[in-house]
Design a protein with these regions (language model features):
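Acidic, metal/ion-coordinating pockets
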Residues: 19-265, 271
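Sec-dependent N-terminal signal peptides
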Residues: 4-13
């Protein structure tokens, strides 16, 4: 039987033989506030060599590492909150740390408008980093979404959606994956046609700095499982919220629902 481990910078799962198993590591929001950008400034460029030094081992040891890229790579001027545009060197550091997949559907993906969305995709493609959530046009989305990755004999599908984009509207022909049940249901059907071993929905939702999820998130998570999603991973609140493992009443399967798993790189203090 194939076994999938889901990790949150801590090992999660059962001790099994190395055969027919894969480890997936999910981390929270990868951000760049102004203090971080200023601290990385070095001469005419930016140096992020030490950015992930304390967690690089865990990231690189996972078979697949997935993070939420909650900045744009919109070019200069580089800015932190409220409209993020991170230096390209930050993405290089993320790649060097061992990340394989970055999620881009979040409330900051339109911070630098059409240019920022498209340049972010261009940079991700240039470094051959898999990504899901935003697209230059509908044709690009149709071609590459749902995101299917084959690794260690596994077929893994990743879905990614956001609750909103801070009131900013998407400029045609760009596409942002917003949370829309009708569209998500179609995407899940498309995902199932790819005959994956697992479908994981990565949702950008919830209330910032709230220790517990809203009822609407719990209902949506359960709906996703009912539609055929195997696991649900959440982001946006910037704090760790309860995680549960749900037994499937119809099969021996167990579903991980992690509503929020906080951020990995940011410059914020929660009291």
């Amino acid at each position: 039987m194939k076994q999938i481990f889901i990790l949150f910078l801590l090992w999660f799962g059962l001790s099994l033989s190395a055969q027919d198993q894969i480890s997936l590591l999910f981390v929270g929001d990868l951000m760049q506030h102004q203090a971080q950008i200023d601290a990385a400034r070095q001469g005419d460029g930016y140096n992020y060599n030490d950015c992930f030094r304390h967690v690089k081992k865990e990231i690189s040891e996972a078979d697949m590492a997935i993070g939420n890229l909650e900045v744009t790579l919109g070019g200069k001027p580089y800015r932190g909150y409220p409209a993020f545009s991170a230096p390209d060197e930050y993405l290089h550091a993320i790649k060097e740390a061992g990340f394989d997949v970055l999620l881009t559907a979040n409330n900051h993906c339109l911070d630098k408008g059409k240019l920022g969305l498209e340049r972010t995709i261009l940079m991700l493609d240039s470094l051959k980093i898999h990504h899901a959530g935003t697209y230059r046009n509908p044709e690009e989305r149709h071609k590459s979404y749902p995101l299917l990755i084959e690794k260690n004999g596994f077929r893994i599908v990743l879905l990614n959606y956001t609750y909103g984009t801070n009131g900013l509207k998407t400029d045609a022909p760009n596409v942002v994956n917003y949370i829309n049940r009708e569209q998500i249901k179609k995407d899940i059907l498309d995902a199932r046609r790819k005959l994956p071993d697992v479908i994981i929905a990565c949702m950008h939702w919830g209330v910032e700095y709230c220790s517990f999820p809203e009822r609407s998130e719990c209902e949506l998570a359960n709906w996703l499982i009912e539609q055929g999603v195997d696991h649900v991973i959440g982001s946006h609140p910037h704090v760790l919220q309860p995680m549960e493992i749900v037994k499937d009443p119809r099969t021996p399967a167990r579903h991980v629902i992690a509503v929020s798993y906080t951020h990995l790189r940011a410059h914020e203090t929660v009291l």
